Amino acid sequence: MRFGIQIVPEDRWQTARVKWRRAEQMGFDHAWTYDHLNWRAFRAKDWFTAVPTLTAAAVETERIGLGVLVASPNLRHPVYLAKDVTAIDDIAGGRLILGLGSGAEGFDSTMTRRTPWSRRERTERFEEYVRLTDLLLRQPVTTFDGRHYVANEVHSYPLCQQQPRVPFAIAAAGIRGMRLAAEHGSYWVTTGEPNRLVSAPYEQALPVLRQQVEALEKACVEVGRDPATVARLLICGPSVGGVLESPAAFFDAAGRFAEAGITDFVVQWPRPCEPFSGKVEVLEKVAEELDRPRNT
């Protein structure tokens, strides 16, 4: 199993850079940030955006994989996203992973629109978003005429350091999203039970995870892909609780998640208060174990 850390972009860089550098020193396989203008409880608090954060993190680190969980149609057109992704991947020396999701409803998604998207429109936009972003990152010139997105002879020079493009980590819970992950994803991303914001013991997430993994594998078979070629990434966000209560809890959770089919286990950098309250000392103790032999 691979282990990752997600860092809330709330700190000024002189503080944040220490977390990103420490994540690499701790031995995590990948480190992630959020892609929002504001987010939930942080609406009236300090919040920095994903592109400059990842750019700075790319300069600050050397080995660790870097990514966003997740970019969505809420914030930017695929043409602008693709250009930023290519630049960050270059600065990072080919370490970027692009997380993509349909985007949550709420104030973050309506700041620049008069009316919110319907669920159907959001799903349609996400499908076009993934397909167009894929084309923009794979080929030097792209023309695309979709229902929601247009690209007219967009020149993508240079292409990504990683070929044929940066890996996609596609967040999905429904049938259409699972199919997108099966078609385009190097990773499939889940937070456990969809739309659950109340914390629950991590054991309670296992039945949902098993069902979701089964749905992903079915989608892979339907599109003619070997299910084993798609990594399964779990973000332990608000709904999956208790994983950093102790090192024992962390590795117990990792073992249970692995048995459910998860390959990548991402926890939140502990904060002094909710959300994601916890002790950095526990994370440090977990890190001490990461290089030791274990069953997971």
List where the protein language model places each region.
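Active-site-adjacent structural elements that line small-molecule/cofactor binding pockets in enzymes
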Residues: M1-T296
